[in-house]
Amino acid sequence: MSELSYRRILLKLSGEALMGDGDYGIDPKVINRLAHEVIEAQQAGAQVALVIGGGNIFRGAGLAASGMDRVTGDHMGMLATVINALAMQDALEKLGAKVRVMSAIKINDVCEDFIRRRAIRHLEKGRIAIFAAGTGNPFFTTDSGAALRAIEIGADLLLKATKVDGVYDKDPKKHTDAVRYDSLTYDQVILQGLEVMDTAAFALARDSDLPLRIFGMSEPGVLLRILHGEQIGTLVQGRS
């Protein structure tokens, strides 16, 4: 096959992606399939980092709307991402990978603290790095955490796996005539009011000229195909 188009990537997975057909928690078959995809990409020569959301376990913003203190809820959400990171670490290690979980909040008996230079070193040594607990601050989503970590480690591409296979001009679940974009600039996303990721995360990626690809991960082998340069999903980069 062709050489890889990207040397170092950060893959953002939603917590819901781990649920499979369930309403809550982690489906072992799903996390095992995702782990195979990640290892396949790494074995092809890519340095791979992951950020996983926590929505399959807990959503701080949702409970805040019901009266819970927002900061407390967000801290609980951060812990949910650590749970998912540990589950993914276990799945990857069972397949023979070397993995390090690095948290933005201190849980020293469970995982490492996030230290930028150490994270980069892990990747250079062939380890998969999983970044947990978002940015470590309330009021920021795991999308923001993914964008921040991708910039910090010097990722060539931020990949966001979603339930749909790219960015559309309108909701494809509600509109049969929805059109998918193959590529967009950051300015076009803003002007057209398209939903790609939350505002803070989007601003981070745009201001750092970080290429972002939105894609669906339901098809086996899709991550490796992207690494080899196939135009899958929607690529967001540059300015108009």
From Swiss-Prot:
Main enzyme class: transferase
Q: Which of this chain's residues are annotated to bind ATP? A: K12, L13, S14, G15, G55, R59, T162, Y168, D171
User: What subcellular locations does the record give?
Assistant: Cytoplasm
Q: GO cellular component annotations, sorted alphabetically?
A: cytosol
Known pathway? Pyrimidine metabolism; CTP biosynthesis via de novo pathway; UDP from UMP (UMPK route): step 1/1
> Matching InterPro entries, A to Z?
AceGlu_kinase-like_sf, Asp/Glu/Uridylate_kinase, Uridylate_kinase, Uridylate_kinase_bac
| Amino acids binding UMP | G54, D74, T135, G136, N137, P138, F139, F140, T141, T142
Instruction: Write down what this protein is called.
Output: Uridylate kinase
Q: Tell me how this protein assembles.
A: Homohexamer.
What are its E.C. numbers? Answer: 2.7.4.22
Which domain of life does this protein belong to? Bacteria
Q: How is its activity regulated?
A: Inhibited by UTP.
